Amino acid sequence: MSGAGAASRVRATAGVTTVWGRALHAELAKVVTLPTMWWSAAVAGTAAAVTMMSVLHGVLDGQGLGFEDVAPVWALAVQIGFVAAGVAAAGAEHSTAQGMTSLLVMPARGRLAVARLMVLTGTGLVASSVLVGASLAACPTTSTAALWAGGRTVVWMTAVLLLSAGLGAALRSVIGASAAAVVLVILAPQLAVFLGNAARWLPGQAAQIWLAADASRADVTSAGLTILAWTAAAQVAGIVRLVQADG
């Protein structure tokens, strides 16, 4: 009996692994084959290149310039591509047949949501790491501060992707999610002129503090928690909408 029980547990574990593998593969395939994702990646890459060329051209011989000095401005431009990618990834689920395909591969909506979160997180980390790494290499000087700034930038870009995707999944409207993401992420630093110190609780303005080279540790921690809270809230809202939706 014990041998049969062990064999049964092995088969069950293998079955679960296969199901998760299929779900992750399906979600990754959707991300890779969605044309809008590639266009968004091109926008982000172009923004990174143009920003670095502009900054390096504006500094005398580029001497002493590190990525920690560039990160806030760099993020303002590059995050546009990540916003577009996140909204596009979520929008494809309810505006095309991809959503039904996902449910056929993984009928359990909770597991599907986790698989989607894992794939988007991995995609954001890889894409942002490539862009940040190239920009770090383009800077004349590299220091510990620059590496820390690069790491925080990778975190922020991944958060932008997840935040935008969460808004898209929760609102189920490309226009609505795009508008919300633009206000919260892209326009937030400009809104600080009208909102004053209250704007720091918006993710876009919190990111500027998170990436600033001269920000205090307390301010950086507060900004990081603000970004985490917004990202988690958007993802939870999207997951709840997916689990409760009829299709």
Model-derived regions, located:
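Single transmembrane alpha-helix segments in multi-pass membrane proteins
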Residues: 86-98
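C-terminal and late-domain segments of enzyme folds
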Residues: 204-206
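Membrane-interface capping segments at transmembrane-helix boundaries
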Residues: 238-247
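A short amphipathic helical element positioned immediately N-terminal to and/or at the very start
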Residues: 20-32
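Short helix-to-coil transition segments within interhelical loops
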Residues: 103-109
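Internal alpha-helical transmembrane segments of multi-pass membrane proteins
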Residues: 175-179
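Secretory targeting signals
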Residues: 3, 10-15, 26, 35-89, ...
